[in-house]
Structure formats: C-alpha cells, structure tokens
C-alpha cells in the first residue's frame, strides 16, 4: 500500500525520496526549488511505487495500514506513531509475523503531532505539571504501550515495549538521520502549509497519471514562484 491523497500524506511520501537523491526544497538562499533533476527522480520513483500498489487513494496513514493489517498487502511505509494500529486492529492477521526496516534511502522524515500549552491557558502551571507527568520516566512505559511515542529513552529499552513494538528500537536508531521540514526567510509571505498544498496537488497529479512528472514539477515551481514574494534584500 502507498499513501496518497491529502496535503500531508503526499509530501511525506515524496520528500524522503527527494532527500535520498541529495535534493532539497530550498537553495542556499532559501528560494523554493522543486523543478530539479533530484525532484524528478524522486517523483518518478513515487509514481512507479504507486503503480505497483493496490492503487487505492489513501488519504491518511491509518487507512494505508488497513490493507497491510489484513494481510492483503506485503509492505507499506508509515510513520511509527501509526504502526501500533497494526496490532490493535481487529482485522490484523499478521501479529507476530512482522518485519521492519528504516525507510529506503535512509532519509526518514521527523514529524508528528505534539501536546502543547496555548497562550490563553488559564492555568499554565497546572498544564506544565501535567506535561511533566505525561512525559516522565514513570509514565513512559504505559504511555508507549498504549500506542504513544514517549520522548523518554527508557521507553525504548523497556522489554515489554520492545516485545510488543519491536520496530521502536530501529526507529530510535533512525532519529539521527531523520530530516525535518524547515522554513525560509527568502520570502515575505512564506507559509509551509501553503507550500505543501501546492506541492501535494502537483505530486498527486503526476502519481495518478493526470500529467507527467516533468509537467507537475514545472507547474508546481511556477505556482510557488507566483504565490510567494521574495524579500527585497534577495531581489
């Protein structure tokens, strides 16, 4: 199974392939550069991979895992915070039969949701105390066994956790090579979400065969150039 279908999923499939090729989203000045040879190779690989899948448009990773969990698909790539669904799913017929490995190319993405405290919080001290408890070494085993991802190193060496979620040990070894998304000071109106909206739209068109990879990247570059305004110091 291969994820495709929304503004988060499609870039998350495309970007590890781009980084594997040595490509980047921004040049040294911070200008968005998606119409490159590296991006073309990455997009072609994404398209070829999708052609070998069940060709279902999965818009979230939980749906991607359904075909894998019921045994109808042999392989999938997913963020580890979704992987616990494989074992928790009532459909799962593969418990105890799993293999796992770092993402091909060795350039996984670092991302995911986090818990935070809003500026308007009426009781910030209480909220901080809750987060201290939630992310403590004492809470980490239960938090992780329930499918969460703890920042505590102790969780990744816990025997019960390693037996239930064996891929977490491999995931921890991948953290140093994980790639993070970054912003850009090149533009006065830069928005990471808007950039991903544009990128996702054209990546999906290429993967689904609506246009060629070459056309998709050229059109994505043109739309980003038109949408984002460079700061005067870069003109």
For the regions a protein language model found, what residue spans apply to each?
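Short amphipathic alpha-helical coupling segments at ligand-binding clamshell hinges
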Residues: 38-45, 122-134, 142-145, 216
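Paired acidic/hydrophobic, glycine-rich loop segments that form the ligand-binding mouth/hinge
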Residues: 74-79
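Ligand-binding "clamshell"
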Residues: 17, 86-103, 165-169
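Glycine-centered hinge/linker elements that transmit conformational signals in sensory
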Residues: 17, 28-58
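A bilobed periplasmic-binding-protein/Venus flytrap-type ligand-binding module shared by bacterial periplasmic
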Residues: 111-123
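Long, aromatic- and glycine/proline-rich binding clefts that accommodate carbohydrate-like moieties
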Residues: 96, 146-198, 203-205, 230-235
